[in-house]
């Protein structure tokens, strides 16, 4: 009734009119004259005013005619059941949701992975630079994570350990305005998808006796719940001050020790674990209802979204105001290889130094392998082994360049996600692209090899047919010139200074009469197979036919010598060069090569253990035949075994220098390692495709005593093995880790 009296003609009555109307109504109900009750007015005025204010406040606040509306719990429960049933029909089976179904649900709402969003910041008055250190660990392991944040404002620089933020909208008591820092910029730290703090339903939802809070809630994280033995743990307590907002602390800190809200991007396994549920068990409708607040908190806090600046991916410039609260900051550790504000990497530097020194030492010891292979250097199996090693080097060099170095130089490297919901397809896309490029190289290698084998097969058939025809003609001829007459003609041609071309061509045609065994024994064009043999072992007739065959294969090269002269010239050339000159050539030529290899290995180990291992395997495989070749050259030059080993080891020291420079550049210089990877990829591709592939294609298999088909299979085995090694390292590089236990 009083609410009705407070309005007149649809408008709100004033205070005086409302009091007068209340008095008149009261006395009329009592049946008393209004004029006789004037004396009661001083006593009734305060009571009626309070009653009127109470009626207006119960109504709807500002409008006295408003009516309070209560929530229909029955409808809310029905709606909840309807939505839950829809979710269970889509992601569950037989009234329950499995772990796989929960993963699909998280994927559907965008909580399956961390998403990066490019944010463009317009002109800002102040710069606030964030640089993140991320390190990924295994699934469901709780570790500490440190975010070094450097704040620059005016001339004041301070470094704090920044916790992972939640969007804040705390009202300002003085001005009535909200802070615009996180609401305007939406800057969120990148969190671990696999390791987070404990997540429970906030107690302000379940406890009615909890004190009222402002619009944003602060959750104090407990340090004691984490293991103190975790590495790289940094705890820092700090207070943010504001001019207008008073400092407050939580009185119920003991409640938060057991009910902390997680602000990180959690996977399905972690959500179940933090709610006290087993991963093997299926979720019922009641169980799933407990997870809904946690999922809503993750969606609301946008903890699975990472914002990157369009111009600088690691530096976010924004104007930032800090709220007043005390935090005990705890973070989760990720093994990404991002750099912090000083340009240093989160990968422990001792791993880079240890891996680099071990790799360079092992590669340098390849010079000693030549000592073991000395007895095999003049045998057929040595050429067989070198052919396989050259093919293996081609596979590892090109595989490392296309599957590892180029993807890393473009920033498409693995971040070490070993959790179930990692974007495995997206992270491996550069690997499959590089594998496609490798398949193109291999297809061209096969085509060229098949063309060579086809041409050799055709020439062989034509040669056999021609030999048969010539033999038939010789047998049918009545007058066949004897071998002595041929020798006379040859001597005449020699005395005429090689002018008798017709006679020489006749002798070359006569050489076709020899069978394959005679040709192999007498008409061999290479002089390396007979190094060290005396002149008495060769007949003049054999020597001369060797000259003619070699002369014909060299297209009448003017510098044609006998086998004896060629060998003596080669030996004399090395002897005139001297040991000092040869040593200088080996140290400078091979040393520069080792320096570039060490530079690549050092930079790769600063990127990670798997990266360093991949590059080390590639360098090892191509250095093995290279070192064996250098060792053989030095021995044939007249050096002793000890001298050859010494000079090879001296050239290997350049690898240590390159490794040291590579680690220093890769670990302390920002964004330089990517350029080193690109340069190394170019060097590896050049060595593989320009130096080693031609050696494989033009290798004379008949010299080593093997068929061309056998060499073809051997070289294919080496190339495919090299490709396979690099592919395995590229695919499983996130699982290659070194844990020394401290």
Swiss-Prot record:
Topological domain spans for side Cytoplasmic: 375-385, 452-644, 693-710
Gene Ontology biological process terms, A to Z: cell migration involved in gastrulation; epithelial to mesenchymal transition; intracellular monoatomic cation homeostasis; intracellular zinc ion homeostasis; T cell differentiation in thymus; T cell receptor signaling pathway; zinc ion import across plasma membrane; zinc ion transport
Keyword line: Cell membrane, Glycoprotein, Membrane, Transmembrane, Transmembrane helix
Record field: compositional bias (Basic residues): 316-339
Observed effect of gene inactivation: Homozygous knockout zebrafish lacking slc39a6 develop normally during gastrulation.
Membrane topology, record value: Multi-pass membrane protein
PTM description: Cleaved on the N-terminus before locating to the plasma membrane.
The keyword Cell membrane is assigned to this record: yes
Domain of life: Eukaryota
GO cellular component: membrane raft; plasma membrane
Residues exposed to the Extracellular side: 1-353, 407-430, 666-671, 732-742
Residues bearing glycans: 94, 127, 212, 232, 237, 267, 337
Localization per record: Cell membrane
Reaction equation(s) it catalyzes: Zn(2+)(in) = Zn(2+)(out)
Region Disordered: start-end pairs: 148-182, 191-210, 220-260, 310-342
Pfam families named in the record: Zip (PF02535)
Biased composition (Basic and acidic residues): 152-165, 239-260
Skewed-composition ranges (Polar residues): 192-206, 222-236
Key word Flavoprotein present: no
Transmembrane segments: 354-374, 386-406, 431-451, 645-665, 672-692, 711-731
Role: Acts as a zinc-influx transporter which plays a role in zinc homeostasis and in the induction of epithelial-to-mesenchymal transition (EMT).
Sequence similarity: Belongs to the ZIP transporter (TC 2.A.5) family.
Protein name per its UniProtKB record: Zinc transporter ZIP6
Organism annotation: Danio rerio
